[in-house]
Swiss-Prot record:
It is an enzyme of class 2 (transferase). In the N-terminal section; belongs to the bacterial glucokinase family. The keyword Transcription applies. Residues 341-642 are annotated as: Putative HTH-type transcriptional regulator. One of its GO terms (biological process) is glycolytic process. This is Bifunctional protein glk. GO terms for molecular function: ATP binding; D-glucose binding; DNA binding; DNA-binding transcription factor activity; glucokinase activity. PROSITE patterns: HTH_LACI_1, HTH_RPIR, SIS. ATP binds at residues 23-28. The chain crosses the membrane at residues 576-596. Residues 461-600 form the SIS domain. Residues 1-340 are annotated as: Glucokinase.
Amino acid sequence: MSTGAQSKAAVAGQHADGPRLLADVGGTNARFALETGPGDITQIRVYPGADYPTLTDAIRKYLKDVKITRVNHAAIAIANPVDGDQVTMTNHDWSFSIEATRRALGFDTLLVVNDFTALAMALPGLTDAQRVQIGGGARRQNSVIGLLGPGTGLGVSGLIPADDRWIALGSEGGHASFAPQDEREDLVLQYARKKFPHVSFERVCAGPGMEIIYRALAARDKKRVAATVDTVEIVERAHAGDALALETVECFCGILGAFAGSVALTLGALGGVYIGGGVALKLGELFTRSSFRARFEAKGRFTHYLENIPTYLITAEYPAFLGVSAILAEQLSNRSGGASSAVFERIRQMRDALTPAERRVADLALNHPRSIINDPIVDIARKADVSQPTVIRFCRSLGCQGLSDFKLKLATGLTGTIPMSHSQVHLGDTATDFGAKVLDNTVSAILQLREHLNFEHVENAIEILNGARRIEFYGLGNSNIVAQDAHYKFFRFGIPTIAYGDLYMQAASAALLGKGDVIVAVSKSGRAPELLRVLDVAMQAGAKVIAITSSNTPLAKRATVALETDHIEMRESQLSMISRILHLLMIDILAVGVAIRRASTNGELPEAVAQAKARASDDETADVLDWLSHGASPAAKDVARD
């Protein structure tokens, strides 16, 4: 089918990187399609989820059925919250890692979004044939759009125009408190209160809410209702003319209309309010002839305001495909030329100046960036149909030192390459899966540390260490590894240092410390009472304590300076893995900082930088940094090998 959903920058024709896989995964069925070009969605097929052990199996079956051997980019709308890399469906037994699924299927890109977010992103591209206007009003171009989706729950969202794109709002507006507007709705509220401690709009105007209304009205009329009556049966009875069912539907539509009017006022949705989900669509003419529109406008002094806002019922058969298509197109656009990805912008700008052979490498990097990142040079050369020296020349044409440097910059430029959340390792994971999860979790934690680290505290810690008379590193258990590493680095500065992993040695040594001495205490939990008592003794004698630990712990609160390294690995029952890496990195940062201070005659950072620039050939100055492997001279490499 041709969807008519095109972005403002859409180009006619087929996608240069091949067909894109689109999916709409619900609790019962998984729907798949191919998008061959902007708005051209074909090969729509539906597969029962129960027939396939995993989502990966269902996707493979679809690709086999449509005879597609290679898909580069894919996007999935799923009826489930999506928060991080691991998705566990609440209405089906599928559970999967987004990144592991991408690797298993060989995709360059795999996006997974909530189905209601996808539905919201579909709205700007809907044609008149894919929606029915309910009542009057005229939508204002480039204005906020509202969306309600009465289905199993009551989804609420909005779209905000931003330049040439739309931003979808995340919302839990369906859980706003239900506010009855007449005596009949008062009865519904009273009945619902007997079942729920909080009666939200979702309780009464989502699909299951129709049953609540039906039973409340039956109780009013003293009618007995079978325990098996559900929303599907109520709708069928209403279509057949049953009086109680008709009143139930009318009440339901009125409540939904009142809520939609409130959403329109809240968002200022002059671009219109859309109704999605399956319930309203199944009501058909019962919905279009109901009091929905009248109740939408009935807002007292703002009735005239709402009269000008149109309301639409979404009738498109597969609206989620339109939304994930738009989201995927925006993601790929950002990657290939957006301001968020400087390396891709550089490739695009320089492409015409490259040799024909180098252009083939450039095209491979733009269209298949993960192939460049993951493959050895021999495979990259084969895929681009060039020689290996051509690959190296291409990298240097972009200002990179070589292929490794280019791979690093390319990986940094990829949007959404590394999941910024923790992925759990499960029994049965292959080495590829659990290996990638361990690496991804560590990289994710490092990136989050970079975003949240208090560098003012880092500067204070460096000043304290640089002026210390003696530095002692304390770590118990696994943290002793970090303490020993710190001792190895810092004794080279000519400062008396030692590392203790034994509590009794820590207590004995701390009792001898005083003013000018510094303890660097490394602890994952920050709660060991024995260590805290040792530090109290040293601080009372005038020593300072730098803590490398988690935030809001007793150690962090006691320390002179706390360098907080929060992460998902917080339970004391877990072996320190990620925390150990973060603590080692903090030691590296402190060591580099002290090295820079020591490169200056007076210890001041600005002068150290100036001297380093003026004396770039001075081996003695350069070696202060280079033995830490963060300098630039060849001398660093010799030390790093030891």
